[in-house]
């Protein structure tokens, strides 16, 4: 997808590759911050799949430290999960769940990225990490998941060196501006925000009926200005 000033991934097309080669040895060439940022997507896949989340909690620190076996397992399982989801809903046409589930954490994350300007101050994975924790917090507030899940996610993300809360960032954000960004997210329908929420690891779902005031209150409680 192509980023615009209005938001992330707003322009794009569907063209499937003939072959995907994943040479995990090349991960050793990444700066540590970039490798940690990539882990946010693995953690997301873990929260979507359940068993992978348990593995992430146990092996995440080793993976971001560059352990070849841990990295290979993370890449393999992430590709396996994403391929299955995309094959079942290639063009994201499913009304419920489907490919949209891969956007767990991204509604919040894309808004944060857009506010920061895509200049490298906040990497995509760092924004997604914070988005995962916020999505879990929103889920808990709405009564969908256990109250301890957000803290468990934050603990894991901090444990691998990722930001997980808005207070981890050096600047403050406006709740109103972030919500305005989320209304323009590619998952939005007629200006209504859609989120991927969770009932627990392995039990994620899409929701288009989240009250905007609940989102704004969450953001203010997390440290945003009004």
Positions of PLM-derived features:
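C-terminal charged capping/lid subdomain of soluble metabolic enzymes
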Residues: 40-43, 144-226
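Alpha-helix initiation and N-capping motif
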Residues: 32, 36, 49-56, 68, ...
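Alpha-helical scaffold segments in soluble metabolic enzymes
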Residues: 19, 25-26, 38-45, 55, ...
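Structural motif
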Residues: 9, 18-20, 126-129, 194
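A glycine/threonine-rich phosphate-anchoring loop and its flanking beta-alpha core
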Residues: 1-62
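Active-site segments that bind and position negatively charged phosphate/pyrophosphate groups
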Residues: 59-176
């Amino acid at each position: 997808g192509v980023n615009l000033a209005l938001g992330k991934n707003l322009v794009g097309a569907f063209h499937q590759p003939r072959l995907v080669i994943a040479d995990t040895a090349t991960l050793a060439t990444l700066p540590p911050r970039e490798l940690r940022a990539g882990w946010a997507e693995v953690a997301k896949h873990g929260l979507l799949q359940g068993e992978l989340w348990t593995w992430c909690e146990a092996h995440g620190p080793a993976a971001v430290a560059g352990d070849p076996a841990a990295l290979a397992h993370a890449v393999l399982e992430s590709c396996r999960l994403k391929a299955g989801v995309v094959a079942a809903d290639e063009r994201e046409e499913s009304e419920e769940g489907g490919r949209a589930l891969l956007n767990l954490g991204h509604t919040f994350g894309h808004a944060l990225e857009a506010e920061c300007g895509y200049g490298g101050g906040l990497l995509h994975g760092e924004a997604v990490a914070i988005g995962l924790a916020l999505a879990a917090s929103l889920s808990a507030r709405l009564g969908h998941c256990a109250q301890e899940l957000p803290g468990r996610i934050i603990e894991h993300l901090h444990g691998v060196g990722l930001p997980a809360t808005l207070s981890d960032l050096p600047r403050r954000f406006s709740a109103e501006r972030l919500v305005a960004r989320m209304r323009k997210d590619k998952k939005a329908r007629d200006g209504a925000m859609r989120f991927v929420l969770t009932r627990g690891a392995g039990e994620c779902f899409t929701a288009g009926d989240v009250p905007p005031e609940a989102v704004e209150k969450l953001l203010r409680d997390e440290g945003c200005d009004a």
